[in-house]
Amino acid sequence: MIETLLEVRNLSKTFRYRTGWFRRQTVEAVKPLSFTLREGQTLAIIGENGSGKSTLAKMLAGMIEPTSGELLIDDHPLHFGDYSFRSQRIRMIFQDPSTSLNPRQRISQILDFPLRLNTDLEPEQRRKQIIETMRMVGLLPDHVSYYPHMLAPGQKQRLGLARALILRPKVIIADEALASLDMSMRSQLINLMLELQEKQGISYIYVTQHIGMMKHISDQVLVMHQGEVVERGSTADVLASPLHELTKRLIAGHFGEALTADAWRKDR
């Protein structure tokens, strides 16, 4: 039996803004929610703009502090600020590599920084791990001397994936990571991610608005609307028998209708 890798218990986030001298506005970006993720599983979080899905992703990655709730990985609690422990287990790929990669650093420096910060590896060991990771994502050893602007868009996203993989995490969170790529490059990256998952047992949390991409990459899905989960289940079940009006609308907008089990398998 595959045990739970990541467990989320009643996680929530409320933002408070000052709107005047004596007034504050409260926005409940993510209402209390819970879910689990198993090793080698892909969970898609889908919803419209402002649904809270990116805020949830940033809480999972440790980028923003939850208002309430618990996070556990391998039954070990995660706390806000435990960057070294968390970054060796949960990593993130961002939507736009052009803004998330330091343009003044060579690829070797970009990939070496997490290793220097979070491991005790010697320089030669770090160099070997950098080269190995680059090969894993389809980049050449010669690319170590390149700057990000010297790479094509697909190569930049491969570099973003390499940076996520460099510490050999158990979970990778991808926040609209492939949205800016054309269909050909997107398909290549999806196949690469699935290949790495099969070989290394990586679990993915994929945040997206693209229900077609969700269909091809995920096992389970959470549908979010205005900060709460309005539908959840296996990807096949949700696509074949959606219950919430938002889910039905998203499916109809992409496929034209809900997919039957036979049609889902055939199209997949």
Swiss-Prot record:
The annotated topology with respect to the bilayer is: Peripheral membrane protein
InterPro entries on file: AAA+_ATPase, ABC_transp_ATP-bind, ABC_transporter-like_ATP-bd, ABC_transporter-like_CS, P-loop_NTPase
**GO terms for CC?**
ATP-binding cassette (ABC) transporter complex, substrate-binding subunit-containing; membrane
Domain (ABC transporter): give its ranges. 6-251
Drop me one GO molecular function for this one: ATP hydrolysis activity
In terms of superkingdom, the source organism counts as Bacteria
Q: Which PROSITE patterns match?
A: ABC_TRANSPORTER_1 (PS00211), ABC_TRANSPORTER_2 (PS50893)
One Pfam entry for this protein is ABC_tran
> Can you cite a GO biological process for this protein?
peptide transport
Organism name? Escherichia coli (strain K12)
What name does this protein carry?
Answer: Putrescine export system ATP-binding protein SapF
The knockout note for this entry states:
Single mutation, decreased extracellular putrescine, in an sapBCDF operon deletion no change in resistance to antimicrobial peptide LL-37.
Binding sites annotated in the UniProt record for ATP: 47-54
* Listed PANTHER family: PUTRESCINE EXPORT SYSTEM ATP-BINDING PROTEIN SAPF, TRANSPORT ATP-BINDING PROTEIN
